[in-house]
Curated annotation (Swiss-Prot):
Protein name in the entry: Phosphoglycerate kinase
Pathway given in the UniProt record: Carbohydrate degradation; glycolysis; pyruvate from D-glyceraldehyde 3-phosphate: step 2/5
Organism of this sequence: Staphylococcus aureus (strain bovine RF122 / ET3-1)
Subcellular location: Cytoplasm
Any GO BP: gluconeogenesis
Binding site for ATP: 206, 294, 325, 352-355
Catalytic activity field: (2R)-3-phosphoglycerate + ATP = (2R)-3-phospho-glyceroyl phosphate + ADP
Amino acid sequence: MAKKIVSDLDLKGKTVIVRADFNVPLKDGEITNDNRIVQALPTIQYIIEQGGKIVLFSHLGKVKEESDKAKLTLRPVAEDLSKKLDKEVVFVPETRGEKLEAAIKDLKEGDVLLVENTRYEDLDGKKESKNDPELGKYWASLGDVFVNDAFGTAHREHASNVGISTHLETAAGFLMDKEIKFIGGVVNDPHKPVVAILGGAKVSDKINVIKNLVNIADKIIIGGGMAYTFLKAQGKEIGISLLEEDKIDFAKDLLEKHGDKIVLPVDTKVAKEFSNDAKITVVPSDSIPADQEGMDIGPNTVKLFADELEGAHTVVWNGPMGVFEFSNFAQGTIGVCKAIANLKDAITIIGGGDSAAAAISLGFENDFTHISTGGGASLEYLEGKELPGIKAINNK
């Protein structure tokens, strides 16, 4: 069933509560990556154009004690948003009370207000994170309609998403709608053939994704640290590479049942240490020396993976191919980025988290159909789970 989106709502003169995802990295009070703010702009600008009065909610980090408040205030976000919108953004350094209510009452059509970090409410019994019903009801009372544009928290049942949805007509923002369309589309209505590329450190993080995608994808390419558990399951020598002993049986079982779909590395860049100065050797993936650790996929594997991607109509990628934070172990991830970017007529999706960070930091931001803003949310969506934040959005 299609979900309501913000453009389905009558917004003129309405106080519109918008749950955005402004959980941005900060260093000394400065925003170091504004991607999440940029992604929220289309929804905010649309509501301004339609004459809505916007009340923005977001969390930022984890507020565990009183001393966390000062460094996790959303004030820098309000300032950045004001510059991007080229208009004043009223910032209220509170999450409830008369001051907030009065500021909302003063809003005119097209005005924008940002409420303080919703997780300030976690100091007193985790009211935000545990979806305290009274808090959700109170926040809902501050507006007329609710727009959820925070895909990054869609897998969480919090007061500021599901709690507010319980009491107000709820629609998806444009970003949330995009995530439902692309990430949800892979799971529910994929354009075949589908190739999934899975990387990152651990098999355990991706088990449920693999279990779900193996029934959807035509091929599953496995790289990154998790590949070594699969190579070990085939009886290959992996040296001191990352290994999850307790996942070898899972890998064996998967290879027995779906070996024709699974593509593993054929060569590996190995070294003795995580360093840009480390001595690197490229060796076949079945004979990694006993004192060496696999750090990245090798050049033959990059070519193999690129060949396997040819002809795909949908590609979904989650997890880097190597320790990309070190430039000498980033070539595998760069090679896969290039191979995906070169595909013609394919829907290409990065499922958030480290692979999204890698693609953006390596300069491939504009070469994919969609780069998800959700880490855990993307993974759980790819597992085939119904996410509470999406479930709470009204159907059309």
